[in-house]
Amino acid sequence: NINDIKDFGHNYRLVSESKKALFTIFHQKNLIFPPHLRFSLQCKDLLYNYIPITTILDPMISNDHYEIIETLATFMLDADFEVKRAAEIMYVHRNTILYRIKKANILLDQDISSWPFCHELYSAIAVWRLKNNI
């Protein structure tokens, strides 16, 4: 089918353009889908166009709470918002993950599960991870 070939070619180009960003942001993912590719390209654009999306992380950065940012990155990007999976990836107890999420809510003065803040935070965390690993 010609459409399958076009889709394959399009997805191959997406992977080629976003491979480094993709595996930096989603380094624990075993399965990658086209939305992951598109999101990685968006984050790459945000990073290289100096769009200040990571400023929402400033309350955690200014207080040296990098373990909370790493926990949020693992929880949101790697574990798909699953506390148990995040705890397994980080080799900590699930209550540690819950404590750090609660601490993030306090530091950010927002509920990280509320929409649209959750989407903004997800993007900021991804760009932060990309920025700190390139």
Where would I find each of the regions flagged by the language model?
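Cytosolic nucleotide-utilizing catalytic cores of signal-transduction proteins
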Residues: 1-134
